[in-house]
């Protein structure tokens, strides 16, 4: 029988991805860690604040190894959702940490790093991409270089005909990311009644 896992999630932006995943998984992370300053609460998804603020831990914008350890300790898995810091090697090796990436780096390693959606969009006129996707990979000190554990993809015949803007393409990849995360997390975490997300 699968036991309950303790799940912590980190973000630096709005936390909206965590909220969307949680409502579909049926529970929130046990702890939600952000390096967003308290004065920027208005930039965090209001529904996430309303439903799960008691799970929040605020860390400095540039945490030390000790600050990471204190926030992450006593957990089974850690997921990153728009967390804009490269984690120290000691933290990567100490915990099971997973990150999502909106580029099919298993097929196109050039999409590693920042803004892969824009890379695909702006290069498409010269080098058309017909396979697109989202991956979840283990976090190691090198950016987007950890083992890929889950991926979802879709095909296009013509990117510019099927999407009328970069924003619409990003939205499609975002929806795919939510699907990928939900399946990934459900396969690892059982859902105790006290943690249901509504």
Task: Outline where the language-model segments fall.
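One-carbon transfer enzymes
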Residues: 1-198
């Amino acid at each position: 029988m699968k036991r309950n896992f303790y799940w912590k999630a980190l973000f630096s932006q709005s936390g909206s991805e965590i909220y969307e995943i949680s409502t579909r998984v049926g529970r929130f992370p046990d702890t939600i860690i952000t390096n967003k300053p308290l004065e920027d609460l208005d930039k965090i998804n209001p529904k996430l604040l309303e439903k799960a603020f008691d799970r929040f831990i605020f860390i400095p914008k540039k945490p030390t190894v000790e600050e990471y350890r204190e926030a992450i300790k006593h957990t089974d898995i850690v997921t990153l959702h728009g967390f804009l810091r490269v984690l120290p090697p000691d933290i990567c090796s100490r915990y099971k940490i997973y990150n999502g990436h909106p580029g099919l780096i298993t097929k196109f390693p050039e999409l590693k790093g920042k803004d892969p959606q824009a890379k695909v969009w702006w290069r498409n006129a010269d080098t058309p991409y017909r396979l697109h996707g989202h991956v979840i990979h283990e976090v190691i000190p090198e950016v987007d270089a950890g083992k890929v554990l889950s991926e979802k993809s879709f095909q296009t015949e013509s990117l510019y005909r099927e999407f009328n803007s970069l924003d619409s393409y990003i939205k499609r990849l975002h929806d795919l990311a939510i699907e990928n995360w939900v399946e990934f997390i459900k396969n690892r975490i059982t859902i105790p009644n006290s943690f249901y997300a509504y």
